[in-house]
Amino acid sequence: MLIPTRIKLNKSSQTLELGYADGQHFALPAEFLRVHSPSAEVQGHGNPILQHGKLNVAITQVQPSGNYALKLTFDDGHDTGLLTWNYLHQLGTQQAQLWQDYLAALSAAGQSRDPSESVVRLML
């Protein structure tokens, strides 16, 4: 298990910064963490539920959960789902691919990252 040696919430950039003893460093944006929350609300019960409109979401609180995870609270009220050390490290190492997959899923579903935007598909 890779446990971060440094955890910092950068409020100005809304990123959770994780540093590891081996020199790895990840900066995970709030939106990325929100749409990849391990909660049942996001992951469903075997069928992930696509999150949209989370462009401006912010992390309001970071709390340790025992010696194995973090609990994040977001300003949209979401506060369920524990991000284990292993899951956080996985998000960091796979961030680029996970983000591209998320953007592709949004596009395929006709959804937007922007909560003030609705995507309209014309049937021609």
Residues covered by each model-derived region:
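Motif-centric detector for short Cys/His coordination patterns
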Residues: 1-124
